[in-house]
């Protein structure tokens, strides 16, 4: 590849079930020059998120779907190499919706500057980026945990779950994570300080909840949906809060999304289940980011990035999210 060539992955069709390489069109195009108000960014790292699967679907959502023939949407960090925008200078590092490509050329809507001297660039896609903001606001605003309460998280060894669980510990809660595999569960307890971990691949989730949550569940932070959501609903306490942050077990379904059978537990326990979209809190990101950075500086918050190299691996790397292969925040090094 030369400096004048931009490799891109475009959405070729709307997938039924899992996205595959055939879901995308790969192309190489010349790199243009920024027009008035635009910047040219050399992409360095791209964030791979479960939400990307939803962005491929047509229909009403919190954000318009990626259009057929458009560059696949992805958040990322990169360096400005040409600018025709007074707000950004050559050499600036930025975080924004860069797309699955080598270079971003366009208006920097919603972009903001980051400092590689303060933290490694991939961290601005994990704890210090949208992932961290999701964990922070979903837990603290929707979950509203109180010291001494029991907080359970699914997808607990993933990007959002691992950070949200640590924040719950900082708030004085008993924290139990649900993850797939002994290594992930060991990481939650030994490295992140969780009070318990349930290996859904090798043990019965109901039994694990009974063991690790003998007093029931006050806050459930759901990233997976499906049978695990149903199991936790059966253990809710009075006035419990259920945060619907994601449902990764359902995103690739070819049939209708499976609803919870135990939803009457919400009625009996006067509990609340609420959906969450991080962009609702955009005006508060700066203050939250300062608090998150402070926790990290004190060693109270750890961030794990799972970095895969090579833009050309994008379709296969994306599938790691849905098979549970990733360990921490999945990042693609361009």
Could you describe each region identified by the protein language model?
Residues 204-215:
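Short amphipathic alpha-helix with an adjacent loop that forms part of the alpha/beta core around
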Residues 2-4, 279-334:
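C-terminal hydrophobic helical "lid"/dimerization subdomain
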Residues 227-301, 334:
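Glycine-rich phosphate-binding loop and adjacent beta-alpha segment
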Residues 30-48, 56-100:
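Glycine-rich beta-strand-centered segment in the early N-terminal region that forms part
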Residues 72-78, 89-155, 300:
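NAD(P)H dinucleotide-binding glycine-rich loop of Rossmann-like/cofactor-binding domains
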Residues 125-203:
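Mid-domain Rossmann-like dinucleotide-binding core that forms the NAD(H)/NADP(H) cofactor-binding site
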Residues 102, 180-188, 205, 257-263:
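Short, glycine/polar-rich helix-capping loops at beta-to-alpha or helix-loop-helix junctions
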Residues 95, 152, 198, 220-221:
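N-terminal Rossmann-like NAD(P) cofactor-binding module of classical short-chain dehydrogenase/reductase
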């Amino acid at each position: 590849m030369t400096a004048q060539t931009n490799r891109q992955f475009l959405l070729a069709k709307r997938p039924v079930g899992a996205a595959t390489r055939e879901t995308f069109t790969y192309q190489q195009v010349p790199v243009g020059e920024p027009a008035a108000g635009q910047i040219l960014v050399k992409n360095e790292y791209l964030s791979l998120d479960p939400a990307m699967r939803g962005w491929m679907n047509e229909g009403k959502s919190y954000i318009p779907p990626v259009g057929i023939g458009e560059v696949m949407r992805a958040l990322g960090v990169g360096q400005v190499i040409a600018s025709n925008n007074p707000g950004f200078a050559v050499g600036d590092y930025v975080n924004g919706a860069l797309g699955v490509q080598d270079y971003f050329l366009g208006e920097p809507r919603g972009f903001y500057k980051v400092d590689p001297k303060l933290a490694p660039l991939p961290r601005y896609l994990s704890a210090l980026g949208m992932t961290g903001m999701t964990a922070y606001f979903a837990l603290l605003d929707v979950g509203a945990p109180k010291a001494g309460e029991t907080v359970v998280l699914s997808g607990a060894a993933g990007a959002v779950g691992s950070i949200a669980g640590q924040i719950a510990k900082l708030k004085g809660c008993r924290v139990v994570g649900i993850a797939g595999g002994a290594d992930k569960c060991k990481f939650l307890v030994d490295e992140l300080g969780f009070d318990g971990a349930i290996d859904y691949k090798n043990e019965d989730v109901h039994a694990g909840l009974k063991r690790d949550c003998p007093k029931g569940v006050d806050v459930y932070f759901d990233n997976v949906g499906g049978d695990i959501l149903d199991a936790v609903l059966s253990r809710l306490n009075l006035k419990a809060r259920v945060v619907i942050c994601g449902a990764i077990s359902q995103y690739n379904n070819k049939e209708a999304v499976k609803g919870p059978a135990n939803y009457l537990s919400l009625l009996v326990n006067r509990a609340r289940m609420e959906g969450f979209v991080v962009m609702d809190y955009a005006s508060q990101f700066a203050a939250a980011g300062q608090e998150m950075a402070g926790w990290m500086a004190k060693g109270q918050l750890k961030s794990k990035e799972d970095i895969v190299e090579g833009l050309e691996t994008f379709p296969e790397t994306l599938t790691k999210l849905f098979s549970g292969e990733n360990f921490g925040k999945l990042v693609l090094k361009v």
